[in-house]
């Protein structure tokens, strides 16, 4: 554990840097710096030596060359315990640098601006910063390297305890963080420039680099014989399973996380009133809008009480005492998630200590565009996440849907978007009454939806039907008519659309085309 005698500080994000530098100076640490950082530290009353004075070589090329010098990198890479290194450093007048505090030009923030030019992007590619970070991290046995202001206090506390030194264990952890940081930085540059290698801007670059951070180890994966872990993106900007706060309960499992994500993304579709989504095996088994959250939960539960057992329950408003009590008294539940949880509701759920209670914060009315990825053997499928709802709505039957039917059609359409294909959803009065999911034939999904409704004691007559994709034959319409469906919403686009529309007309049904498919696999 060597004492810190000299630190090179050059940061774009100057959060906390003055106070940190003052405490370093208190240990007698000599501070080297450049540009705006040096100016800021001097204005704060600190003694600072310019890097150009340290190297005996001026900054040049509009600041592009500041720290790219043997006296800097020799001072970082020279191994203090290697006699040949020490002799070489002495022969060339290279003095050791014991600490590097650097963060990088804000490339990602720059290219996120809608008017960012290629020239602006290139000028915000840091060269000297990553080079110093990597040199210092490589020689972490002798050099402390900081890239994150959140680590300043940890290092200062350790220096206080050890008389101005930092342990090798801390140095190693900080070095790993540096390589993670520079990998993400280079990945962002590669992704952005890689989309501009031809004419115009490609939607997807030639190579794709992502970085995820391990958030949680797991007992097992989808099945007990599979190992697993949960990784999250950097800087997630909307309410999600990745950012949700767990208030109580057992650790989230692999399946819990996947199912809760499905429930949360589904409930985000509903903002016209209190709503509840119940999910089992990533499929909504009950969705409803109600006068309040208790009413919404009651109605969602009634769709399929059997499937709701051991399910995931999501709400679009603050979980209150009444809804929490109804859940705890009525059923076994794995996860409850809501934007907010009242203190009283939290107390009630605490009676079931294993129930995982999550608070995710309120989401925006419109979700942020993002990529959806699916791993296949030897590759990765990448697409834009399906955030759209429908294209042009077109009534294609002789009969127009009533106002009430249209409200229910749009309700069931939103649910169908989150049901595994082939998906059929029956609904009435802002409530699902039957969900047919994941069948290889669409007509069988329709039959299952009817069976589910009958089993739950719900009246199908007068309900509407949503289908995530077109009907290839008229049998799905005939089947729906037999159980009392009065209106249908579907994308359209089948070779047999005319036959399907004719079937709806024969049964006196209204049919709306959405011009948009929502397969979900």
UniProtKB/Swiss-Prot annotation:
Residue ranges annotated for the MGS-like domain, each copy included: 1-147
Keyword Aminoacyl-tRNA synthetase tagged: no
Pfam families hit by this protein: AICARFT_IMPCHas, MGS
CDD domains: IMPCH (cd01421)
SUPFAM superfamilies named in the record: Cytidine deaminase-like, Methylglyoxal synthase-like
Keywords: Hydrolase, Multifunctional enzyme, Purine biosynthesis, Transferase
Pathway where this protein functions: Purine metabolism; IMP biosynthesis via de novo pathway; 5-formamido-1-(5-phospho-D-ribosyl)imidazole-4-carboxamide from 5-amino-1-(5-phospho-D-ribosyl)imidazole-4-carboxamide (10-formyl THF route): step 1/1; Purine metabolism; IMP biosynthesis via de novo pathway; IMP from 5-formamido-1-(5-phospho-D-ribosyl)imidazole-4-carboxamide: step 1/1
Catalytic activity field: (6R)-10-formyltetrahydrofolate + 5-amino-1-(5-phospho-beta-D-ribosyl)imidazole-4-carboxamide = 5-formamido-1-(5-phospho-D-ribosyl)imidazole-4-carboxamide + (6S)-5,6,7,8-tetrahydrofolate; IMP + H2O = 5-formamido-1-(5-phospho-D-ribosyl)imidazole-4-carboxamide
EC numbers for this chain: 2.1.2.3, 3.5.4.10
Gene Ontology terms: cellular component: cytosol
A GO BP entry: 'de novo' IMP biosynthetic process
Top-rank lineage group of the source organism: Bacteria
GO molecular-function term, one example from the UniProt record: phosphoribosylaminoimidazolecarboxamide formyltransferase activity
InterPro entries named in the record: AICAR_Tfase_dup_dom_sf, Cytidine_deaminase-like, MGS-like_dom, MGS-like_dom_sf, PurH-like
Hydrolase keyword on record: yes
Family label: Belongs to the PurH family.
Domain remark text: The IMP cyclohydrolase activity resides in the N-terminal region.
HAMAP family per UniProt: PurH
The protein's name in its UniProt record: Bifunctional purine biosynthesis protein PurH
């Amino acid at each position: 554990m060597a004492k810190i005698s000299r630190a090179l500080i050059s940061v774009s994000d100057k959060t906390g840097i003055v106070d940190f530098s003052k405490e370093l100076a208190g240990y007698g640490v000599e501070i080297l710096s450049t540009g705006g950082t040096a100016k800021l530290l001097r204005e704060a009353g600190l003694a600072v030596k310019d890097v150009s004075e340290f190297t005996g070589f001026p900054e040049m090329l509009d600041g592009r060359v500041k720290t790219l010098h043997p006296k800097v990198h020799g001072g970082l890479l020279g191994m203090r315990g290697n006699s040949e290194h020490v002799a070489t450093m002495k022969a060339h007048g290279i003095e050791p640098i014991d600490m590097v505090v650097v963060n990088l030009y804000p490339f990602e923030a720059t290219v996120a601006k809608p008017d960012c030019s290629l020239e602006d992007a290139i000028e915000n590619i840091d060269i000297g910063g990553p080079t110093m970070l990597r040199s210092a991290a490589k020689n972490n046995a002798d050099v402390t390297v900081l890239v994150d202001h959140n680590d300043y206090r940890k290092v200062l506390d350790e220096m206080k305890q050890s008389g101005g030194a930092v342990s090798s264990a801390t140095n190693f952890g900080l070095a790993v963080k540096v390589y993670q940081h520079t990998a993400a930085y280079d990945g962002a540059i590669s992704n952005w420039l890689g989309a501009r290698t031809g004419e115009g801007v490609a939607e997807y670059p030639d190579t794709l680099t992502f970085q995820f951070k391990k958030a949680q180890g797991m007992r097992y994966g989808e099945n007990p014989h599979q190992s697993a872990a949960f990784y999250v993106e950097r800087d997630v900007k909307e309410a999600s399973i990745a950012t949700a706060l767990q208030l109580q309960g057992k650790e989230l499992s692999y399946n819990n996380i996947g199912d809760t994500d499905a429930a949360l993304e589904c409930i985000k579709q509903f903002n016209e009133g209190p709503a509840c989504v119940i999910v089992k095996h990533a499929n909504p088994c009950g969705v409803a809008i109600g006068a309040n959250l208790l009413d919404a939960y009651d109605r969602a539960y009634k769709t399929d009480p059997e499937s709701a057992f051991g399910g995931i329950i999501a709400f679009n408003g603050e979980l209150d005492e009444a809804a929490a009590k109804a859940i705890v008294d009525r059923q076994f539940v794995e996860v409850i998630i809501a934007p907010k949880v009242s203190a009283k509701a939290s107390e009630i759920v605490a009676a079931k200590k294993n129930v995982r209670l999550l608070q995710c914060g309120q989401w925006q009315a419109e979700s942020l565009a993002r990529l959806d990825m699916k791993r296949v053997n030897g590759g990765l499928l990448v697409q834009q996440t399906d955030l759209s709802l429908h294209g042009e709505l077109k009534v294609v039957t002789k009969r127009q849907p009533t106002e009430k039917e249209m409200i229910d059609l749009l309700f069931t359409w939103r649910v169908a978007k989150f049901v595994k294909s082939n998906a059929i959803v029956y609904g009435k009065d802002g409530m699902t009454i039957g969900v047919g999911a994941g069948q290889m034939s669409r007509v069988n999904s329709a039959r299952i939806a009817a069976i589910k409704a009958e089993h739950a004691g719900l009246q199908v007559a007068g309900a509407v039907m949503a289908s995530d994709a077109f009907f290839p034959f008229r049998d799905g319409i005939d089947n729906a008519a037999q159980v009392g469906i009065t209106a249908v919403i579907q994308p359209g686009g089948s070779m047999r659309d005319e036959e399907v529309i004719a079937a709806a007309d024969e049964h006196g049904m209204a049919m709306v085309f959405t011009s948009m498919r929502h397969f979900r696999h």
